[in-house]
Amino acid sequence: MNKEEIRNCLSTLYDAQALRIATSNRLFQIFSKETENSDTDIDSSKLNKSILEEYEKITDYKTDKKRSIKATLKDLKDELELIDTEEKFEQVKAYSFLLESEKTYNKLLQKAVEEHPVYTEFLSNVKGCGPLMAANIIAYLDPHKARHASAFFKYAGLDVVISTNKDGEPLTDDEGNLLTHGRSRSDTEEYEYVNKDGETATKKGLTYNPILKSKLIGVLASCIIKAKDPKYSKIYYDYKLRIQNMPKHQNKSKGHQNSMALRYMIKSLLNDLWTYWRTKENLPVTPPYAVSKLDMNPHGFNY
């Protein structure tokens, strides 16, 4: 699969996943009524497992005995606690189909990603980054459009925004420095797009991909820490210790400091990825902002 095909497969997988989750929740509502008089709390995962076990028992019996569903339910009525009608059987059958569809797309996506050079040569070496996470990165990031690593940061929603008051005026600290904050859904901007008539127009909205941001910060970051990736987990802990000892950050909560360190770690990963990917595509590679604009010394895999 090429990049576009991986993106389409990923989108279809998430659509199938959303439908499966919604169906699972509906089944839980239906079948939990069967156990609502129980003295114990109802566990949705255990209930779903029990439903699928009964479904498998019914389908196996139906196939082996060559019986109809109606006859099978009658034969097994003393062994079944949940699926006792044809209507319930058909609902679980549809749910089972969704599960299999999701597994199929997962396998297709995993196979495609494991053959993609960005995964085999770079992302597979990052502990905590599996094929599905890599699929999100490959599908949504484009080195041809990102002339600088900061373009990856912005598209992933990891750039900083100048804080303003209610009148839109920039806020500053006591020393006159501009105050900034991490980009969120409330930080919208005007940008150009091509409308249905093929004309360039402007509209106000998000300038980043919220799905990619949630995957990178909400999933990948914690996976890297848990997997103890030798490079990026060290970047996280070093930066966290650094900001804990900086006067301007000492009053921030531990959660805030942790979020800052996670963002810094993911940005370091994206910077390295951008450098690798642009080089792979024979595209120009520029030094990081800290090197080119702030005259800081380069380090690691900067360029």
Q: What do these predicted regions represent?
A:
Residues 253-290, 298-301:
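Basic, amphipathic alpha-helical segments enriched in Lys/Arg and hydrophobic/aromatic residues
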Residues 41-51, 176, 182, 198, ...:
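Extended non-catalytic scaffold regions that mediate assembly and binding
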Residues 5, 43, 48-49, 238-245, ...:
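Amphipathic alpha-helical surface "interface" segments used
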Residues 122-123, 137-259, 263, 276:
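Phosphate-backbone recognition surface of nucleic-acid-processing proteins
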Residues 1-115:
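Long, charge-rich intrinsically disordered scaffolds of nucleic-acid metabolism proteins
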Residues 4, 8-11, 15, 86, ...:
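Conserved aromatic-histidine-acidic binding/catalytic patches
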Residues 101-143:
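Coiled-coil termination/hinge junctions
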Residues 4-25, 29, 135-140, 214-222, ...:
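Short, hydrophobic/amphipathic alpha-helical patches that form generic packing surfaces
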